[in-house]
């Protein structure tokens, strides 16, 4: 039980004991039992707020971080706690980082009841938190308890030795060597995506206007992207293509949408779950969470059925290593222990990779000059060939810049909270146990002191080295002082295990889209990132796709 829960219940029992003493030994006897119950409730309702207020004021006054700069305090009770859950996620933290300097590389602000938050604002502090001392911190208990509903008992919800041990089971599957083997499957899935778009264009009525000599249609892009990336997740997890892009296994697609679609009710429940003691939170009824539990049960049953069917086959490797085949070959397979990991891989394909690819396609549509540059690079790289070799996608500097710059501006996770589980330090500054640490990819990725005055603007050139005009190459850090300044995939020992897979799929999908379609925004609507965990565009977000002619004149 959390320390806060224990303190609240202790106050309640002390109040009850005090009333017992008054009635048993001092002769203060109420005329009926209702007065006794009322007295207990009154005692509890008075003592609890007084205790909380006293503790809050004491913690704020005695804070060892009061000398650190941060946003202006709003009030002494809950202060900036709701800025953590703002929408779009991390917007306020990004503004705070850019509005002033932080000489020590640390920002400080208070949250609910005097809880303290430290946000590293430079790469030195980030390296310590994410790499050097990464296991001095854990995801908050309330977050882990809530995320079990989405991911099960998996890498997302695990910590310390269990997390470290299970992370190693992912590495052989998601390392660059295995992803190289999977690349043809990623290209094939990207072509299925394009075929789906083309099928929509085929159904365009005669009255639909033509653009650039090709058919055109407005496409709900987010739904289609999530189908493709969810299929990819199942290929790496189980060696099974769900083929949701072809209209199959839509029951799983609907279940994931039920879990991850963001709405007002879910946001309120998420905030309450993080702020209230667990025993109070459980008393609040929620139809939304009941439907989420049904979706979770459906997904568990579906994954178990697919896993058992795959294990019944004689060959489970499918020409590449999957998470399931790796566990079986290693002799570590345990049905109950790893079912959550399999679900998480598919869920990450649906939510994290799906959101990332959706935003890259949006940036392609919103930056027409960049789209033209990518198309020109692809045309020149093919040298008359029908298609590129698999390893060529990863060597194209403009394509790489298109993907990296889009992911920089739209990281999957805007803000990640950690809690110090032991006394530690950041850049020599003492961090007591229990302090909350805010890792803010959105703010770091858009910090002017790290990326320059145009940090919040789209700029392909920051990722391209043109020192040799005839042979431009990729610039790994985008001009930032350290790789830790680009947090779209995290950094260090707790970084995203699926980075190589995500980059390989996104590059191929963008290249094949640009070769076949011209993409435009339909209106001035901006896809504000939203979501309980990963940041995604709205499910109804749409872009215009128009077929382009093959060849140089399509540019």
Sequence positions of predicted segments:
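Cytochrome P450 I-helix active-site segment
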Residues: 183-187, 209-215, 251-260, 317-324, ...
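Conserved cytochrome P450 K-helix E-x-x-R motif and the immediately C-terminal K′/meander segment
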Residues: 82-98, 305, 386-427, 550, ...
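Cytochrome P450 heme-binding "Cys pocket" and the immediately downstream C-terminal segment
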Residues: 199, 368-370, 481-482, 495, ...
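Cytochrome P450 heme-thiolate monooxygenase catalytic core
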Residues: 36, 139-145, 181-357
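Short, small-residue alpha-helix embedded
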Residues: 352-365, 509
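Conserved cytochrome P450 K-helix/beta-meander segment immediately N-terminal to the heme-binding cysteine loop
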Residues: 439-476
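N-terminal membrane-proximal hinge/A-helix region immediately C-terminal to the signal-anchor transmembrane segment
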Residues: 2-165, 187-192, 243, 295-298, ...
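C-terminal helix/juxtamembrane-tail motif
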Residues: 1-4, 536-555
